[in-house]
Amino acid sequence: MSAKNTFAKALAVVVLAGVSVASYAHHSFAAQYDDKKPLKMTGTVTKVEWTNPHVYLFVDVPQKGGKTQAWGFEMGPPHMLQKAGWKKNSLTIGEEVSIEGWQARDGSFTANARRVTRTATGEVLGAASSAGQTLTGSSQPVPAAK
């Protein structure tokens, strides 16, 4: 085997390994979210971004003193949400929802949504998150938020 072929093969292995690690990190729940920090909150839908690789739900959550805090929730990819019965217009701006999930490790006002519930009807919409849930909600309850 020539040195040129050996170098090319070694380079290919290094590049593929790097891509694999980057891909794993991007899709790793544990890298971004803390499963020891469950949360449940209710707020008003302000925006839904129906994009790949994840759908994002933005909600204003009431705070003490009448103010609100904007939160962003990562959900599963559009095709998984569609399998669960979601459509682009499943939620409307101004609709009140309750969301269960896990807070981001960096402490920001972002979270991975596990379950979205319409407050008015009690209808549960699975969020198809990357935390290993079933499509219709959850195979097990989210631990109580502290």
Q: What is the predicted role of each segment?
A:
Residues K83-I99:
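Short nucleic-acid-contacting surface segments enriched for D/E, G, S/T with interspersed K/R
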